[in-house]
Regions:
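Outer-membrane beta-barrel initiation region
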Residues: 1-73, 77, 157-181
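Feature captures outer-membrane beta-barrel proteins of Gram-negative bacteria and organelles
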Residues: 36-43, 61-81, 111-123, 159-169, ...
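Outer-membrane beta-barrel channel domains
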Residues: 53-148
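Outer-membrane beta-barrel proteins
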Residues: 25-27, 40, 55, 66, ...
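Transmembrane beta-strands of outer-membrane beta-barrel pores
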Residues: 22-28, 43, 54-58, 71-73, ...
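A broad, low-specificity signal for short, low-complexity segments enriched in glycine/proline
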Residues: 36-38, 99-100, 146-152, 166-170
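C-terminal outer-membrane beta-barrel translocator/porin domains of Gram-negative envelope proteins
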Residues: 85, 91-93, 105, 153-264
Length: 264
């Protein structure tokens, strides 16, 4: 009976990466397309969906897997990616939390592995021409990038646990519109690294976004605000920011971080 969850229904000579949860909350829409191949599966009820993919980018042959089950609440989504790049070993060599000097050594020929298990309740509160929803969520993430633990005297892999709550309320869109005409949403998250001991603290993250009409009929304007605070007292490392960096910039390490951005 379990095999009925995996019925191949289509394939494509490309690898397409989609972020399902952000599409649900209207926070972000994006597709990443790479040379490769993808096989898609779905059961007859449409409650189980899967994907196996291969991609080639930047000189790396990569494997990808996705599986989601929505037959009951909560929804479960699992994803894993192998060999998108070489893995890294990160060591704190000098400085303090405000000016950390961390060395990231690339382990050539050692594939990077990342995996996550997300569970959430997509509560649909839509009515009267508005799409509304409340999404409590719990996410576990793993990567074989490693940091040096001075207490343990060895490198340890990364594990993150994030609990969060999202709310969105947007006016239903016409197909020709890039953004909803009116709407807003908010996202509150708490991120921690279990088993990290003296190395990592935790992060509180909040972001809000809103949509307003643009200067012309169809294009709209999206305004975004984000704030995060890392509780890092007595810890050796900072986690990468949950808040997005400005376009064209690499991820930052910050104790306090605030951003405001428009999109048109």
């Amino acid at each position: 009976r379990g095999l009925h969850l995996f019925r191949i229904h289509s394939w494509t000579p490309l690898y397409v990466n989609t972020d399902v949860l952000n599409n649900i909350s209207y926070e972000n829409f994006y597709n990443v397309v790479s040379p490769g191949a993808s096989i898609y599966t779905q059961n007859s009820l449409g409650t189980a969906e899967g994907m196996l993919g291969y991609s080639y980018h930047g000189g790396f042959h990569s494997g990808h897997m996705r599986f989601a089950y929505r037959g009951f609440y909560p929804v479960f989504e699992f994803r894993a990616d192998l060999n998108d790049r070489d893995k890294q070993r990160i060591t704190l060599v000098a400085g303090d939390l405000f000016n950390p000097e961390m060395v990231a050594d690339t382990v050539k020929g050692s594939p990077y592995l990342s995996a996550s298990l997300l569970t959430y309740f997509p509560l649909n509160l839509s009515s009267g021409g508005w799409s509304r929803g409340l999404i409590p969520k719990l996410n576990w993430r793993y990567s074989n990038d490693s940091y040096y633990s001075f207490r343990e005297g060895r490198y340890q892999d990364y594990q993150h646990i994030t609990v969060g709550l999202q709310y969105y309320q947007v006016q239903r869109m016409a197909l020709r519109n890039l953004f909803p005409k009116w709407g807003f949403g908010a996202n509150l998250q708490f991120n921690m690294m279990p088993f990290a001991g003296e190395n990592f603290g935790s992060t509180l993250y909040f972001n809000a976004y809103g949509y307003i009409p643009g200067l012309m009929k169809n294009p709209g304007i999206r305004l975004s605000f984000a704030y995060q605070r890392q509780m890092s007292e007595g810890k050796r490392y900072l986690m990468r920011n949950l808040a997005s960096s400005p376009r064209g910039h690499a991820a930052h390490y910050s104790i306090n971080y605030t951003s405001l951005s428009p999109d048109y």
